[in-house]
Amino acid sequence: SFETITTPDPGQNFADQNLRFFPRSVTLPPNEAQVVKVQLLKTSELAPGEYRSHFYFRSVPKAKPLGEKETVKDSTSISVTLTPIFGITIPAIIRIGESNTFVSLSGLKLEVSDDGTPAFGLTFNRNGNFSVYGDLTVDHVSPQGKVTRVGMANGISVYTPNADRHFQFNLNKTAGVDYKSGKLLVAFSSSSDVKPAKLADGELVLQ
């Protein structure tokens, strides 16, 4: 169940009063797109910090005309009609002031299941006034120095006011990679197609 939050938690600010977007509803044919414009409002009145809200986009079921009656096929049984409603949320973040945020990685561990699937886990530790967002890569380095990309997870975030986030995902079962020897090099970088900036890194020696 969901709970409507009207008062931000300590250290958390909402951005909804400083955002305006349009259009608010559209009708899209198949394989068509729609540009949604977002406007910032009254940012000069905001105190330094991070303000976050979410845009929620969802499909709206086509309503039946009033007075239209459904055809009853079998009056002796009970039927249930499920109408799926698809939606997506996109964070909208306003940042005022200079960032003093940094992130570190801790608790690196690797567990191999009975079927041989390697599961890698770690903790993101966030410090500072802003959220962090980026992509995680894991490379295996063999004792002979061969580097193999064995895992990647995009779009990992640690939002304010949270100080840490525990994360785990499965690595690739790549031929020639021995998860009992060598080491894993872990890098957390900002999301960018041009030149990602490394935010944190770590190393796990395998044995």
Label each PLM-derived region with a short phrase.
Residues 11, 22-28, 93, 109, ...:
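Beta-strand-rich interaction surfaces with strong enrichment in secreted/lumenal proteins
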Residues 96-113:
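Low-complexity, acidic Ser/Thr/Pro/Gly-rich terminal tails and inter-domain linkers that flank the onset
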Residues 41-94, 175-207:
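Terminal connector regions
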Residues 119-127, 170:
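Short edge beta-strand/loop segments characteristic of extracellular beta-sandwich folds
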Residues 1-38, 144:
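Surface-exposed binding patches on compact interaction domains or structured appendages
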Residues 37, 163-174:
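Exposed aromatic-hydrophobic patches
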Residues 128-133, 176-178:
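A short beta-turn/strand-edge loop motif at beta-sheet boundaries
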Residues 26-33, 155-165, 194-196:
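Short proline/glycine- and polar residue-rich coil/turn motifs
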